[in-house]
């Protein structure tokens, strides 16, 4: 039993809120999943075609089972998309987002061939870190929790029991020494700052203490009368407005890696002991340089730990802080869940192999560091879970995929199928065309689509070909972008949003246009060199790529090939099987396929529960959407000029429209006002807000230039 299973959590029912009811294959799939899980089956596979509503089916399944759930996705982009969907479907429950908090991460490494040591370098996204803390906080305080996570959830996270033991419970009427309370806040890594009140800090004003938990958008006020807690309240950190009066609150540590003084000293002693043993071993092997290197580095780290409680690369000593035996698995997010949690693995054909590969990739780099005296052997225990350890920590699992892998299919007793789309949308028609003249044919097809305000995805085999093709399209005046591995995660999400919004028409990529991308505006997927067998043109890859056109009524897939390979045949046959089943269902029910209408949301903005003062900072440029707790969460919208522009032309091409709904002088004033707001937001460290304001200012400046060129200014 997990230690945290004994913790009392608030119990509230999972409840799906949706204007739609299960339809198509969904009712049967939900009932069968519910039956199998309740019957105790450990592994269940849901083979769900693209666009059949697997996310909604999962939400209804969670509603039936009423169990805390971990949903794993293969990357941050899909995790964000899933979290948005679950937030909409389960607005009254805690839907959390747990991914790596690094915007940039260069791991510590050593290259023996060139004697090059690369120091660890990273940049942490504070908002994502808050969301990680919010996830663990929800898991330890309530049962109605769905956490959407990337593979980051199998990496070490600190001991949940220590995290719980060091939390500070606050209750009205409790007797507590004020100075002792302040010391406890410092012990759990909160910083006193009476001037700048930000997350992870507290301030003291007479008998009033205010603390801003790292996992919240709101702060907590503690009013003392002598040594008694007289009142507790939740307040807005900027305005000071009281949001609620409370009787009982918890303050969790500001770090998942919190350690008390006694634990710190024990860890330091263990590190010293290991250092002595390792130095003896290296000296016996004649590795004097490595021994000296290790002695200098570790002694410096020990001094830092004893003086300030932390050091650079402290995670490499996690085995000693956790009190684990060498080789034992680390604590991870999985250990924060109660025993009966349910695991859902989305796009399992990608995610399952990814989980299995994490350990070896991490270990090979660290072995080199240990062998050359840069780290103690215990650094190898700061690692992700091995596949066997992961399996030991999960109970029942549901695997979701349009193309389940061999592992998933071998585990379950057959699969639950969900092929029919409630919207009546039919799988795209697959057309095989010769490679001769393929680019000219593709240009012709692109022009046909852009005339109808539809989008196109083009997938190539090599980065060079994708770059050359993008350049060629640009020369022809086609609005095109190139999605590649060098584009960071958040920019990748933004590129997909821009494609849907019509800011360009064609997206060219290699292996980034597959699993889970939800793009209803795409009516054509072009697969170049479809007959070149390999990983990118396997049957599974082709079925996934074909699925990108399955959300559009007039969806088509053009495969450019000179022969039909077994992989192509498999993909085409499976697509035709699904088409026939959907056509028969539509005919039986009298359904006319309807286009999928889906809001074009800013995924990155929606995933975070933004500050309540966003509305004041941004004014009317943003509409408001309620989150599950009734607090307002801003959703970016095109206001004023952008709305007019977007309504007239979804393309967003500057030359097509020059809005004239306000004079240039008024527009210039608005630009100046928004610029001032942008600078103020940046000064207050509200960087997400500042970035959105910057984009809006950029659009308005572009409009002003158009007005001047048209002689309207």
UniProtKB/Swiss-Prot annotation:
Domain Helicase ATP-binding: residue ranges: 35-421
Any one Gene Ontology cellular component term annotated for this protein: excinuclease repair complex
The Helicase C-terminal domain covers which part of the protein? 438-604
Q: What does this protein do?
A: The UvrABC repair system catalyzes the recognition and processing of DNA lesions. A damage recognition complex composed of 2 UvrA and 2 UvrB subunits scans DNA for abnormalities. Upon binding of the UvrA(2)B(2) complex to a putative damaged site, the DNA wraps around one UvrB monomer. DNA wrap is dependent on ATP binding by UvrB and probably causes local melting of the DNA helix, facilitating insertion of UvrB beta-hairpin between the DNA strands. Then UvrB probes one DNA strand for the presence of a lesion.
Q: Which protein family is it in? A: Belongs to the UvrB family.
Concerning PANTHER family, the annotation shows:
UVRABC SYSTEM PROTEIN B
Q: What is this protein called?
A: UvrABC system protein B
State the organism named in the record: Streptomyces avermitilis (strain ATCC 31267 / DSM 46492 / JCM 5070 / NBRC 14893 / NCIMB 12804 / NRRL 8165 / MA-4680)
Task: List the lineage, top down.
Answer: Bacteria, Bacillati, Actinomycetota, Actinomycetes, Kitasatosporales
